[in-house]
Amino acid sequence: MTTLWGGRFSQRPDPLAARFTHSIGFDQRLWDADITGSIAWARAICRAGLLTEAERDRLIEGLEAVRAEWASGTFVIHPDDEDIHTANERRLGEIIGKDLAGKLHTGRSRNDQVVTDVRLWLRDVSRRLRDALIDLQKAAIERAEAGMDVLMPGYTHLQRAQPVRFALWMMAYFWMWQRDRERLDDLMRRADLCPLGAGALAGNPFSVDRHALAEDLGFPDITQNAMDTVSDRDFILEFLSWAAILGVHLSRLAADLTLWCTAEFGFVTLSDKHSTGSSLMPQKKNPDTLELLRGKAGRLIGDLTALLTVVKGLPLTYNSDLQEDKERLFDAADTLMAALPLAAAVLREMTIHPDRMAAALSDDLLATDLADYLVRKGMPFRESHHVVGRVVRRAEELGIPLSQLPLSELQAISPLFDQDVKDVWDFERSVERRRSAGGTARAAIEVQIAQARKLVEE
C-alpha cells in the first residue's frame, strides 16, 4: 500500500480500517479543484525558490495530463488511493517520476490542501446554483405577469381570508428567493478566501506568498489564521444553512401547489411531464415532483444538522471527523441543482384555472372590507370588527350570504350602514383598495414586478 505518511509505522493499515477511512469514493469529485490548487502551489514554491522553473513546468505539465485523464474518464483509481490528493499525486508520479512529484507537497499539508479544494469547488457550484435560482425567479415573474387579472382567496390558517391576485401569491415566492440569493452572495464573501499556505496548522516555513497564491486561484483575499483555516468548516455550515432555508421555501411552494392540484381545490393542473400515475388506480395523476420537492427540505435540513453535530465538540485544530463535511456538502448541492430547474419547469408548464379560483371567492372574504367601510364612516376599528362579527352571525342565522343581508338588518346592527354598502361586495374593488406598497392592487404588484425584473437582470 502506498500512502503519503507511512514512514514511522511498522505495520500496514488494517484493510478494514483502510476501507473505513478512505474518502476517494466521494471526494474524487474534487479532482479538478485539487489539480488547480496543486498547479498554483507549484508556481508558489517555485517563486519561493524551492523548485527550478524547469521543475515547475514539468510538474504543471504532468498535472495537466492528470486533469486530462479525469476529464476524459480514463483516470483509473487504485485500491491504495486514500483520497483525491493521494490519487492525483500517485498518478503524477507515474507520469513524471516520483522524485519530482514528491517535491510538489513541499510545505503543504492535506489540511490546507483539502479546504482549498472545497472552497474552489464551492465557488463554482455556488455560481451555478445562483444562476438556477435566478431562472426560478424569472419563472415566478412570468407567471405573476400572466396571472395579474386572476383573483383568488388568500389564506391564513388554511382558511379563506381575503381576496388577492394570483400575482401577489406568486411574487411572495419571488421575494423569498431573492433573500435566498442575497444570502448566497453574502456567505460566499466569507467562503471565497484562500486557505492555501496555512500548512497543517502553524503556517508555512518557506516564505510562500499567500497573497500571490490567492490571486493565482482567483480568491479576493486570504484567510487570516492558520489554525482557524484548517479546523473550521463554518463556511460549509453557512452554505448548508442557506440550502436548508431555500429548501424550505421550495417545500412551501410545493405544499401550496400540491394542495391546489387536488380535485377539492382544482386551482392548478400540473403538466403530465411533472406527474406520475398509480400502479393500481388507472385514473390517478399524482404530483410526485411536488411531493419530492417538499420532501427534499427534510434532507437538506438533515445535511445541516449532521455537520453541526460533527463539528460541535471538536478541539482545535484538524480532526478526521471533518472528512464528514464533504458528503453533506455534495448532497445539498446536488439536491438543489436538481430541485431548482425542476421547480422552474413546474411553474412554467402548470395550468392555472381562474374559474376555479373565482368560484372559491365568497362574501365572507369581504368581511374585513365591511369593517373598513364602517371605519370610513367614523367608527373605531375595534368596534367595527365587533359589529361585523354580529353581521356575520346574523347572515349565518338567516342562511344567506353576507351580500344578501337586507339593509334593514344591517342598520338594526349599526345605523352607519347606508345604501353605499353595496359597493363593498366587489372582489375587484377589494383588491384594488390594497394599493399600498406590497399590496395586492394591480399598481402595487406592477411596482414589485418592475423591481423584480431589475434584480434578475443585474
Predicted regions and their residues:
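Glycine-rich cofactor/substrate-binding loops
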Residues: 1-37, 281-458
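A helix-coil-helix interface module used to build multimeric assemblies
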Residues: 1-203, 208-215, 276-277, 292, ...
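A structural signal for small-residue-enriched, beta-sheet-centric alpha/beta enzyme cores
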Residues: 110, 223-227, 363
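Structural signal for hydrophobic packing residues in well-ordered secondary-structure cores
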Residues: 46, 63-74, 92, 96, ...
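Charged, flexible cofactor/metal-binding loops and thiol motifs
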Residues: 118-119, 123, 130, 145, ...
